[in-house]
């Protein structure tokens, strides 16, 4: 739980209090569960991206590999450390579910509403991650592919679904779901675009990781998708050279 912005629980708390809710233990458990789900998603994402740094510290699987090397463990340490990372991510997912749903003080109808939203959030994240991984095996993707991936992988579970969960906790009507969609989806896409831009212009100290990590990992961001499809030939050659240099 080191570092991070806590955007998702903040969004849920904001919508909960905006509808008149008062924070209590049950609500705090849901907020913690949302953040634990985010931690689970990051751990698995780092493994799939072969990431080594997160918020200025080694990723879970990288920390495990470094530890195993110091202990002079034997075997395929890369595979073993990634396996540990997968299992730790799974455990975070279990804890997220327990925090959100193992509650006796929440109204049954509220729990049912939370379950529906949480399930939709899970599905969106998984499908978005599949698009992300699929893009890594493609030389180029167009901007519609990147926008769909961003909408599903980032915007939904960063803004749309946390807003909906906060309103559900407060017992609000389902009509607020459309507002969460129209407000949260564009905000989430903008959030990801800013993150992608910082990867290009930020420093290692500012980012908590090495810059150009997206390009190095073969990630197709909106900037590069637009450039590859709407730029001139000189820009195309320069981007291809940059991509080859980093790889």
What name fits each language-model region?
Residues 1-247:
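All-alpha prenyltransferase/terpene-synthase fold signal
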């Amino acid at each position: 739980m080191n570092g991070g912005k806590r955007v998702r629980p903040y969004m849920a708390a904001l919508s909960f209090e905006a509808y008149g809710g008062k924070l209590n233990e049950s609500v705090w458990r849901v907020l913690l569960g949302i953040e634990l789900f985010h931690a689970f998603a990051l751990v698995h994402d780092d493994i799939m991206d072969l990431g080594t740094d997160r918020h200025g510290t080694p990723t879970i699987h990288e920390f495990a590999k470094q530890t195993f090397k110091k202990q002079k463990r034997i075997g395929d340490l890369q595979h073993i450390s990634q396996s540990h990372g997968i299992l730790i991510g799974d455990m975070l997912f279990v804890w997220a579910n327990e925090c959100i749903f193992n509650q006796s003080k929440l109204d049954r109808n509220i729990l049912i509403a939370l379950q529906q939203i949480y399930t939709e959030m899970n599905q969106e994240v998984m499908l978005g991650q599949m698009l992300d991984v699929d893009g890594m095996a493609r030389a180029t993707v167009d901007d519609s592919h990147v926008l769909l991936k961003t909408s599903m992988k980032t915007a939904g579970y960063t803004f749309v679904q946390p807003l909906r969960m906060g309103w559900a906790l407060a017992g609000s009507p389902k009509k607020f779901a459309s507002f969460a969609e129209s407000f949260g989806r564009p905000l989430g896409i903008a959030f990801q675009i800013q993150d992608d831009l910082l990867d290009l212009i930020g420093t290692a100290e500012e980012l908590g990781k090495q810059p150009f990590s997206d390009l190095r990992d073969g990630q197709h961001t909106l900037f590069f998708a637009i450039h590859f499809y709407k730029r001139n030939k000189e820009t195309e050659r320069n981007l291809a050279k940059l991509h080859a240099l980093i790889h």
